[in-house]
């Protein structure tokens, strides 16, 4: 097994029993692949597939003018590189996007020859089509400077669906069947039965009409309609009665209404007897072809065809007419002998279409189409052209109707056709096939569809959603272009005159900026980022709404297995509507979720891996991942637990066709991070998955000692760590950058061969948490491609580290851990274990007002020098200043309106020339309840406005940093070049050179070292080839220098140009404050098993319960939090964590007494290779073993993968290894080593019973008491009611509601109640009165009229009731 540079530093011991057969795929693949398919930016123009932008363009173009003599054709499109990189866009509040240009061709035809079109003129031109936001490498978008995520949508797949109403519509409980044809875009077509068994259709949920109107509209006659849906009985009329053609299966089960005889007249079935199988056999044996029936047997039957008099051509009876005695008389008169009637029965051949045809009053195709037109466009007069146009547009026009590739595939599969491709519009036989299946369902044949089956729901990803928006914009453009195309020739227009890109830009901007599926990225920690991008929502445009979604849609479905996580979903109104993709899930070309399985042939598991969608999976028998497999892949159990078509069953190995790839296949990323998930109740696991996403990154991240082995994948895939793009040697490292000299075999020709990684330092995330990267690599380290070079927020040595490992004791402690409260040791706070840094961004804007421009300045009147002490000469706070609530960060003054001056004042002003207008102080101050350190300031200045000194300094610093990078690259490039040069020059014969080098002298190393490197180029070599090489190297260095100078100039230009600011804004300053949040009572904390609580008390370290060796517990939890909640995983985690730490202590003790390396190696081998997955420690050098041991001193990290974790025996053996009997005895551990004797820190006495103690990975959640604490004395009031606003954000008051009023009434506290309802709330005059009284030193309340009473009076008046106060 290959260990990466970081994995070698600290190996996680895995207890997995099963080998890794399939690596977890890249976790952001769905987002990145979908968007790259949409753009196809890397694909050459000629090879672009018809998907994404290409599909949108080709579906709308060519646009033809109304007269047909001009058309605009699409040739190709190209995307220009973005003007600013991602970081610049975030700083400047811009959108990271690329300009889209399309090459279009305007073709003008000659109007003189309308019969044969002749091209008169062709104009080709590139046209700007708006901006397309680009996806960052981590799958998000930067829109107006903030990172956003486009969530994938789970919607109903296009195609045809059959369902029934479950008997809810009609009081009798009868099942009413219906069918619905859903296109990707276009009109929906519904078919439905009513309680009387008549079949109707409706278009776009409008008024229903008999389905035969639709069938006539597509060109069928009543005869053809009946022929399509019924089989016929043939009768021959005789002078007495008639003869019926004998079809055996049509008679079975019927009651004979007359004696049925064979040809010889022998009675086979007597009258009033039910015809059974024996009777039919007898009739078949008697070779009966016809049965004689009495005439009344024909009465009431329905004619299948029109009956026409052969001589006169007169229609005697129409198809679908009932046979009556008068009809029979007419037939006999016209000497017509053969007639056909419809065969129907009550069991499986209902007369539904026939009875529908009977209520249909339309006569022919045109009448049917007019009826449909009237339903779609009521009130408009139906002309023939309009009727035809509307009907064709409904289902047959490619512009208005698109079934899509998926829809066609699903449709054909459902109606039982073999081919899965076909036209994208609806065909006549599609409508017929749908109605036939619906009638068969009503007849009791076949099954209805399950709409929650993942074969009937598909995922729309970013690319597809963006394509739909782009197409919508293009369609708007098309309308405008059509109008103008007519004038194209007369006005000599070019393509860019025809196309206005605004509709496209606005459609795209609206989608990325304000669509329900475009969400502000959850960036609390790397896991929340990755989960947000893997989320699948059933809400959004074209999806469900919370209110209408029933229980079935939200429920877990058997097809979710391996595709959608059954655990991770929000609590509350969105439960089950927002899901997360399972770990291995993957989208196929149609947008259906697939999951991988291992192929099994003849009871033997192969290495072949197939991805199956929910539809395909139903056809196979699939074994679970925990089935026992021998070395050669044979399934060893007699019966294997497996799934088939959604059912779980035990089958023999020979029936198995596939097998799961991994036990963690069914859960999502967040759920697969919970160790011992299999021992937790599902509801608690749900909370655990959701709360991990809210964990705040700690100051010093610490890897979980008990993990699941997927931590590294999550950390790396989330993009928070820095990965090496190419292998090489680390050349330089500091806190902010890493420079790598790339391996020769990975360097591309003409490339610099240097990779520089600038780390992200103390940057604000969307949730105000801190993003900071710390280098792991040291100078001289050899790294390979993909190795982790630097840790990000919440990662430790390339592994996800959301919390801290705490020594936990499960015991009650003086009621301080009642109801999930948490008791914490002061040591945890003192060591800054849970201290986190939060970064607040504060903005101030200087605008151009009517009274003149606002000014950012240090010169503010009425402010003491103390308050201005932290500002520089530009009026902006220094970096590093520690500020508290109310401190000035940026000084700003705003012009104030002129007050009316008296003539005397005017005179004085005129004489002494005093300032004409006043200014008021509108400086940016630190908001209440906030304090911190200024860590960054950014100044943005509008184009054409003088930059202040501070802004100039910021630009100079940025340029200095950039020059440093370029110099490093140049240093390494030149170093490599001079090394090559030295090797080449050594031993060569010179014709002369600097320092009087004689002709014919051999060049020596000492001579070269004595010379300045640049003077080497002045050496004249005798060998011409070598001289040419010397020139080439000189040129390449010169070229690189020139390139770097150009890059520097480009950067300078970008920085010195004015910033794009909103209209009316002259200058904008952003100040970033770093706020340190220590753990304090009121903060919410949680483990990974849904065991959440609030810190109740921070106890001095000497009062905490401690062990025999004096080690105090960090956290004391209530044992009652475990049994009723059934999350036993936390107890197992604590035991295994205890073993992990114990092993670490033993390794630390070995290193301290400088044990021999063999002893350390042997101990490590014992830990890693006695059970679970073996590690190849023998491949490690002694130095590597030593470094590994040093990193394990704080605990040997364990991995217990979900559903494949550590067993009780393995945990016991690890505890035995960590705590040999002598150590266990000293610690006062029980015999089974699962509990410890604890002592009370306050009395020093031992507690009565032993206590479960161990290490748990505990998280601090983003629900901090600092953000929730809030107090107000006075503040803003609501405009209408004049009552204080509510909530911390509005600086509001506390609500005093109806029930609180009752409480004060019950106490009889009348004065308190009066002031609550008046002066403390909405009595405006009373409020000012109280203030006046207080100033006078008189503490009296004069309560007046509450404003809400006036509002009530006004509201009653608005109802037209004159109400007034009686003011006697």
From Swiss-Prot:
Domain of life: Bacteria
Gene Ontology CC annotations of this record: DNA-directed RNA polymerase complex
Any one Gene Ontology molecular-function term assigned to this protein's record: ribonucleoside binding
Protein name (database record): DNA-directed RNA polymerase subunit beta
Organism this protein belongs to: Paraburkholderia phymatum (strain DSM 17167 / CIP 108236 / LMG 21445 / STM815) (Burkholderia phymatum)
Reactions accelerated catalytically: RNA(n) + a ribonucleoside 5'-triphosphate = RNA(n+1) + diphosphate
Record keywords, A-Z: DNA-directed RNA polymerase, Nucleotidyltransferase, Transcription, Transferase
EC number: 2.7.7.6
Gene3D superfamilies: 2.40.50.100, 2.40.50.150, 3.90.1100.10, DNA-directed RNA polymerase, beta subunit, external 1 domain (2.30.150.10), DNA-directed RNA polymerase, subunit 2, domain 6 (2.40.270.10), RNA polymerase alpha subunit dimerisation domain (3.90.1800.10), RNA polymerase Rpb2, domain 2 (3.90.1110.10)
One record GO biological process: DNA-templated transcription
Claim: Coiled coil is one of the keywords in the record: no
Similarity-based family: Belongs to the RNA polymerase beta chain family.
Protein task: DNA-dependent RNA polymerase catalyzes the transcription of DNA into RNA using the four ribonucleoside triphosphates as substrates.
Assembly mode: The RNAP catalytic core consists of 2 alpha, 1 beta, 1 beta' and 1 omega subunit. When a sigma factor is associated with the core the holoenzyme is formed, which can initiate transcription.
Gene it is expressed from: rpoB
């Amino acid at each position: 097994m290959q260990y990466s540079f970081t994995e070698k530093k600290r190996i996680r011991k895995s207890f997995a029993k099963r080998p890794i057969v399939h690596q977890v795929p890249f976790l952001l693949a769905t987002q990145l692949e979908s968007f790259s398919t949409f753009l196809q930016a890397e694909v050459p123009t000629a090879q672009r597939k018809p998907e994404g932008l290409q599909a949108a363009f080709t579906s709308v173009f060519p646009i033809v003018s109304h007269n047909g003599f001009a058309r605009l054709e699409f040739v190709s499109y190209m995307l220009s590189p973005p003007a600013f990189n991602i970081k610049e866009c975030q700083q400047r509040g811009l959108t990271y996007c690329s300009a889209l240009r399309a090459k279009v061709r305007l073709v003008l035809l000659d109007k003189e020859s309308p019969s044969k079109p002749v091209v008169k003129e062709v104009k080709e031109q590139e046209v700007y089509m708006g901006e397309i936001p680009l996806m960052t490498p981590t799958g998000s978008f930067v829109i107006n400077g903030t990172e956003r995520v486009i969530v994938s949508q789970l919607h109903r797949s296009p195609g045809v669906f059959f369902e029934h109403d479950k008997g809810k519509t009609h009081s009798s409980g009868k099942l009413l069947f219906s069918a619905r044809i859903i296109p990707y875009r276009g009109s929906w077509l519904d078919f439905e039965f009513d309680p009387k068994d008549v079949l109707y259709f409706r278009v776009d949920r409008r008024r229903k009409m008999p389905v035969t109107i639709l069938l006539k509209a597509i060109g069928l006659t009543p005869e053809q309609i009946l022929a399509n849906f019924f089989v016929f009985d043939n009768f021959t009329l005789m002078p007495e009665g008639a003869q019926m053609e004998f079809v055996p299966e049509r008679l079975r089960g019927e009651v004979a209404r007359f004696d049925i005889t064979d040809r010889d007249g022998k009675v086979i079935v007597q009258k009033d007897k039910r015809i059974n199988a024996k009777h039919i056999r007898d009739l078949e044996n008697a070779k009966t072809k016809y049965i004689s029936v009495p005439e009344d047997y024909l009465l009431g039957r329905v004619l299948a065809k029109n009956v026409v008099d052969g001589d006169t051509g007169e229609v005697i009876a129409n198809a679908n007419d009932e046979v009556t005695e008068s009809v029979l008389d007419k037939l006999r008169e016209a000497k017509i002998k053969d007639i056909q009637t419809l065969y129907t029965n009550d069991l499986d051949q209902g007369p539904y279409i026939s009875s529908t045809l009977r209520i249909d009053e339309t006569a022919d195709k045109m009448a049917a189409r007019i009826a449909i037109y009237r339903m779609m466009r009521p009130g408009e007069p139906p002309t023939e052209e309009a009727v035809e146009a509307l009907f064709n547009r409904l289902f047959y026009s490619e512009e208005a109707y698109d079934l899509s590739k998926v829809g066609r595939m699903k449709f054909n599969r459902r109606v039982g056709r073999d081919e899965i491709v076909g036209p994208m519009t609806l065909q006549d036989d599609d409508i017929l096939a749908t109605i036939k299946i619906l009638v068969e369902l009503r007849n009791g044949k076949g099954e209805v569809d399950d709409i929650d089956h993942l074969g009937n729901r598909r995922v729309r990803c970013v690319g597809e959603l963006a394509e739909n928006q782009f197409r919508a914009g293009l369609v708007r453009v098309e309308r405008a272009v059509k109008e103008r195309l007519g004038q194209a020739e007369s006005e000599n227009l070019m393509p860019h005159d025809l196309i206005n890109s605004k509709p496209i830009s606005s459609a795209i901007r609206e989608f990325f900026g304000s669509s329900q599926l475009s969400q502000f990225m959850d960036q609390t920690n790397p896991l929340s980022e990755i989960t947000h991008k893997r989320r699948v929502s059933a809400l959004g445009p074209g999806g469900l709404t919370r209110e209408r979604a029933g229980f079935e849609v939200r429920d877990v479905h058997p097809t979710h297995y391996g595709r959608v996580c059954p655990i991770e979903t929000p609590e509350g109104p969105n439960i089950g509507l927002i899901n997360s993709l399972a770990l291995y899930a993957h989208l196929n070309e149609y947008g259906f979720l697939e999951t991988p399985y291992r192929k099994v042939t003849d009871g033997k598991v192969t290495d072949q891996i197939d991805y199956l969608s929910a539809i395909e999976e139903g056809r196979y028998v699939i074994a679970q991942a925990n089935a026992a497999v021998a070395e050669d892949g044979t399934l060893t159990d007699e019966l294997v637990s497996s799934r088939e078509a959604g059912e779980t069953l035990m089958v023999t190995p020979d029936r198995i066709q596939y097998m799961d790839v991994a036990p963690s296949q069914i859960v999502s990323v967040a759920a697969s991070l919970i160790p011992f998930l299999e021992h937790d109740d599902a509801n608690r696991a749900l909370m655990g998955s959701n709360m991990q996403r809210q964990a705040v990154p700690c100051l010093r991240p610490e890897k979980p000692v008990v993990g699941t082995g997927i931590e590294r994948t999550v950390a790396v895939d989330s993009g928070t760590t820095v990965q090496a793009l190419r292998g090489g040697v680390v050349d330089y490292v500091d806190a902010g950058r890493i420079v790598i000299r790339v391996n020769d075999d990975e360097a591309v020709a003409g490339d610099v061969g240097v990779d520089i990684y600038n780390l992200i330092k103390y940057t604000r995330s969307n949730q105000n948490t801190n993003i900071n990267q710390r280098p792991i690599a040291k100078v001289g380290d050899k790294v390979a491609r993909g190795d982790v070079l630097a840790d990000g927020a919440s990662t430790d040595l390339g592994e996800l580290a959301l919390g801290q490992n705490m020594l936990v004791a499960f015991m009650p402690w003086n009621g301080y851990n009642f109801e999930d409260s948490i008791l914490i040791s002061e040591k945890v706070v003192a060591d800054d274990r849970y201290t986190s840094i939060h970064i607040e961004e504060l903005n101030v804007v200087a605008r151009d007002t009517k009274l003149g421009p606002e000014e950012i300045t240090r010169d503010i009147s009425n402010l003491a020098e103390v308050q201005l002490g932290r500002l520089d000469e530009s009026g902006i706070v220094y970096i590093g200043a520690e500020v508290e609530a109310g401190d000035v960060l940026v000084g700003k003054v705003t012009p104030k309106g002129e007050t009316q001056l008296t003539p005397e004042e005017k005179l004085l002003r005129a004489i002494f020339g005093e300032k004409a207008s006043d200014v008021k102080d509108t400086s940016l101050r630190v908001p209440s309840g906030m304090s911190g350190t200024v860590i960054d300031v950014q100044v943005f200045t509008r184009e054409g406005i003088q930059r202040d000194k501070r802004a100039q300094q910021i630009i100079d610093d940025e340029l200095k940093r950039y020059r440093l990078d370029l110099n490093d690259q140049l240093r390494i490039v030149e170093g490599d070049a001079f090394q090559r040069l030295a090797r080449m020059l050594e031993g060569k014969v010179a014709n002369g050179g600097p320092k009087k080098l004689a002709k014919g002298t051999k060049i020596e190393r000492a001579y070269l070292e004595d010379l300045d490197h640049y003077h080497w180029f002045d050496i004249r070599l005798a060998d011409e080839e070598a001289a040419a090489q010397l020139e080439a190297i000189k040129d390449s260095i010169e070229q690189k220098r020139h390139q770097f100078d150009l890059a520097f100039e480009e950067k300078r230009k970008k920085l010195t140009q004015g910033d794009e600011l909103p209209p009316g804004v002259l200058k904008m300053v952003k100040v970033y404050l770093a706020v340190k949040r220590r753990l304090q009572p009121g903060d919410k904390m949680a483990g990974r098993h849904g065991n959440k609580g609030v810190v109740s008390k921070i106890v001095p370290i000497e009062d905490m319960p401690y062990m025999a060796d004096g080690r105090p517990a960090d956290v004391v939890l209530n044992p009652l939090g475990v049994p009723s909640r059934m999350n036993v995983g936390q107890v197992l985690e604590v035991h295994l964590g205890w073993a992990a730490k114990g092993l670490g202590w033993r390794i630390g003790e070995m290193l301290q007494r400088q044990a021999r390396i063999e002893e350390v190696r042997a101990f490590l081998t014992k830990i890693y290779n006695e059970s679970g997955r073996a590690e190849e420690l023998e491949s490690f050098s002694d130095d590597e073993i030593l470094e590994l041991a040093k990193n394990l001193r704080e605990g040997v990290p364990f991995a217990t993968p979900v559903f494949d974790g550590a067993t009780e025996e393995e945990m016991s053996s690890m505890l035995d290894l960590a705590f040999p009997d002598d150590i266990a005895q000293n610690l006062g551990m029980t015999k089974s080593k699962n509990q410890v004797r604890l002592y009370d820190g306050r009395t020093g006495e031992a507690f009565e019973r032993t206590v479960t103690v161990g290490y748990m990975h505990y998280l601090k959640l983003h629900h901090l008491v600092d953000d929730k604490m809030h107090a107000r004395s006075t503040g803003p009031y609501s405009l209408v009611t004049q009552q204080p606003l509510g909530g911390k954000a509005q600086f509001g008051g506390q609500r005093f509601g109806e029930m609180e009023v009752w409480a004060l009434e019950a106490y009889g506290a009348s004065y308190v109640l009066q002031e609550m309802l008046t002066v403390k709330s909405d009595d405006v005059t009373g409020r000012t009165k109280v203030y006046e009284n207080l100033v006078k030193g008189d503490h009296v309340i004069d309560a007046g009229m509450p404003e809400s009473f006036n509002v009530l009076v006004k509201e009653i008046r608005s109802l037209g009731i004159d109400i007034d106060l009686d003011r006697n």
